[in-house]
């Protein structure tokens, strides 16, 4: 029996139990990730958070009005759950896709099914080109990305960047869930900026949200999320390239942990940024 998400995936016993106890999973999720103090994750939205969510809705709606076709590249992380909820509830004109690299965690595929049950909608999945992927694996091996930065970037290009470029073709703007708090590179971003490498505008409506606010929103709205977050995975990507972090580590320390911090991006977040109304260059990832 096929999973419905991912290439020829067979559900595990854990997946079957989760599917049978959907209501019980909300009890598990209510605990939240261990790196977020429980006392700040209230059961209702605060006035401040309601205002921030309203600002996100306005930013997204303005993006549709100004740029026409807008698409959200859904990472399926915690921030993605906030944006998915807001888009599907308030700005349905925005399309949503996610990239299935073929190396995602089982919990990520389970999350896709939970979201479909909750919202009665399905996120469009895009995949790497099969010929390019076969060539890549033939050249560097199944896990060749561990051997050098160049090999890892080549893997990310085939599995993520190229499918991403196909998915955003024809759109006037794309939406991302990056936040300043996540890394020094992302701290330089602007809410709306021209994405020169991809030839369209980029909208980052959560840029000034804190992680605590992200989880306050998720808990108050009872939104499904990736259960890896409860195991100290604040940032989740491909299974081989993601690990849990230790207390006190940077939020993205679990991504490509064998590399230097300044290189820990996949290429979807270029570091050449041109904000609307201004421009500045800070390098290229």
Which positions does each model-derived feature cover?
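Nucleotide-activated chemistry modules centered on ATP-dependent adenylation/adenylyltransferase
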Residues: 37-285
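Intrinsically disordered, low-complexity terminal segments enriched in Ser/Thr
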Residues: 19-23, 36-38
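Intrinsically disordered, low-complexity segments enriched in Ser/Pro/Gly/Ala and basic residues
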Residues: 7-11, 24, 278, 284-285
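Ala/Thr-enriched low-complexity intrinsically disordered regions
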Residues: 19-21, 30, 281
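Short, low-complexity intrinsically disordered segments enriched in A/P/G/S/L with frequent Arg
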Residues: 1-3, 10-13, 26, 33
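Absolute N-terminal positional cue centered near the fourth residue
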Residues: 4, 30, 41-44
